[in-house]
Design a protein with these regions (language model features):
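Bacterial N-terminal signal peptides that target proteins for export
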Residues: 1-8
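Bacterial N-terminal signal peptides
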Residues: 8-16
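Conserved functional micro-motifs across diverse proteins
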Residues: 22-235
Length: 235
């Protein structure tokens, strides 16, 4: 099945680069580097504020529009979905296995429970109600709803947990919060998720207004890209 995924990757990559080159010719002042995760990843699929990456073990998708609208603010919110792939044993993902790498290459851990309870994040929650993108796109085998409960809105009946069990049938979704020293800045970030045998580094860029305008024209619909990547092998 991998060769079919790789064929899809090549087509998306060529089309994306061609589009970017055309745009750069028209607006040469805008320069955006293609991110290098530094780890083996079969594919990174990009929508405007949605990023997804996977390898032979696991799949992670994120939505970060709220973070991109929070320039200068101290707290970052990211929506994350994750699962493990077929023929991979169930895996217990713990909160200390998730972190963000900032543009200056510093590592930012997930906000702990005490830190989350001590701050008022109602503005982020309100922003998320109008500025979120759907990330409910998973490989076909992951069809059972699953909550990533590292955080829960204060006052809600939901509880916060330190871990979540992933399996190839579970499509797990939840919010992540990080305290960013010095506030959120423009530039290249990575969401790092450590699985049992591998690390996935999902790239996401906090875009300037010019970058958003340029790149928004070049990213296809994320759902179509995911469906193409995980399309069953033809017999």
């Amino acid at each position: 099945m991998q060769k079919y995924w790789l064929a899809g990757i090549a087509a998306v990559a060529v089309a994306g680069l061609a589009g970017l080159q055309a745009e750069r010719q028209e607006k040469p002042k805008v320069q955006v580097q293609i991110p290098d995760p530094g780890v083996p990843q079969i594919m990174t699929m990009e929508g405007k504020f949605v990023r997804a990456a996977y390898n032979n073990e696991a799949y992670v998708i994120i939505g970060y529009q709220v973070a991109n609208r929070s320039i200068g603010e101290e707290y970052m919110m990211i929506d994350m979905g994750t699962t493990v792939l077929d023929n991979v044993p169930a895996y217990v993902l713990k909160r200390d296995k998730i972190a963000v790498t900032a543009p200056d290459n510093t590592t930012i851990p997930l906000l702990d429970h005490e830190g989350y309870r001590s701050v008022n994040l109602s503005a982020l929650d309100a922003r998320a109600k109008v500025q979120r993108d759907s990330i409910n796109y998973f490989p076909p085998m992951a069809s059972q709803a699953c909550r990533v409960g590292f955080f829960a809105e204060l006052g809600s009946p939901a509880r916060m947990w330190d871990e979540v069990e992933l399996s190839n049938r579970r499509a797990c979704l939840g919010r992540l919060f990080f305290k960013v020293p010095g506030g959120i800045k423009h530039g290249q970030y990575f969401l790092n998720v450590q699985f049992e045998k591998s690390l996935l580094r999902v790239p996401f860029r906090i875009l300037t207004a010019d970058e958003e305008k340029l790149l928004g024209k070049n990213y296809g619909d994320i759902r179509k890209q995911v469906q193409e990547a995980f399309k069953p092998k033809k017999k």
